[in-house]
């Protein structure tokens, strides 16, 4: 396959600095990597955090962000087996790990101290050609709608892992905060596909209609509710069995520790800058609730999440714009005006 020497990408040279749409060199895959012609990339809140430098973990600089890239294999490193030119492949948040530490050996590769992160420590998918470790790259069936598949590679895998972490049973209630956003809209669908009943939290009538169209049985609008804890417990006959916090709201996390039912599980996914978990210790003990963090899935979780999608059980509510419009997407994200998931077309 013919691969150019230069490509279009969005790059920033300092955290919070200008987002530059410009020509950069096409990377050469290392012996353990594949080169992917990225057709589409989802835009995640993590990308916004990486650009702004919100987290206590330094990014590489300059940096090409993005970690939900779907495309075609156009280059293969000298030590790679099992991949062929023309295969469909996905770039995930976890670009690579050591595969030798205790975490990697127990299938907890995302917790590897040497993890290489797409769009954070490794140039990501906001470019036309990107590299990925051949072991961690996601396999996508030929014929997959790559624009639709892109958000599955982080948002889908992340919420699927969070729902597994909750350890609840079919027929149980799960509450999803930030349900109208990119992660939340997928969390509703995965929850329904796994047999759970969904109550959604977000703001505004438009998002209420949206989440119900995805399968939420109940909706609580935090902008009008006078007592969210009471409203949720009433709607779920005593409180949900689990709460999945995908919103970037410290207050929402604190509320979930109150409304979850006894023996329920609060799962932390969203990462509000500088936020802390505040929970009444007496209630947490007497109700025997669990508070668990859920990061991203391992290779098995990823394959399972993709399988739900390829079987038609998950529909990604996306809006496709050109890669050059990425700064505008960030503005919408900061204003809380994103419904569903934005996907960028790297050819525009």
Swiss-Prot record:
This enzyme catalyses:
a primary alcohol + NAD(+) = an aldehyde + NADH + H(+); a secondary alcohol + NAD(+) = a ketone + NADH + H(+)
The question of whether Phosphoprotein is a record keyword is answered with no
Question: Which parts of the sequence bind Zn(2+) 2?
Answer: 98, 101, 104, 112
Database matches in PROSITE patterns: ADH_ZINC
Q: What class of enzyme is it?
A: oxidoreductase
The record ties this protein, via InterPro entries, to: ADH-like_C, ADH-like_N, ADH_Zn_CS, GroES-like_sf, NAD(P)-bd_dom_sf, PKS_ER
Could you list this entry's UniProt keywords, alphabetically sorted: Cytoplasm, Metal-binding, NAD, Oxidoreductase, Zinc
The residues that hold NAD(+) are 178-184, 202, 207, 269-271, 341
Main location as per UniProt: cytoplasm
Gene Ontology MF terms in the entry: alcohol dehydrogenase (NAD+) activity; zinc ion binding
What assembly does the database describe for this protein?
Homotetramer.
**Function comment:** Converts ethanol to acetaldehyde and plays a major role in xylose fermentation.
Q: In which family does this protein belong, per the annotation? A: Belongs to the zinc-containing alcohol dehydrogenase family.
Q: What is this protein called?
A: Alcohol dehydrogenase 1
Organism in which the protein naturally occurs? Scheffersomyces stipitis (strain ATCC 58785 / CBS 6054 / NBRC 10063 / NRRL Y-11545)
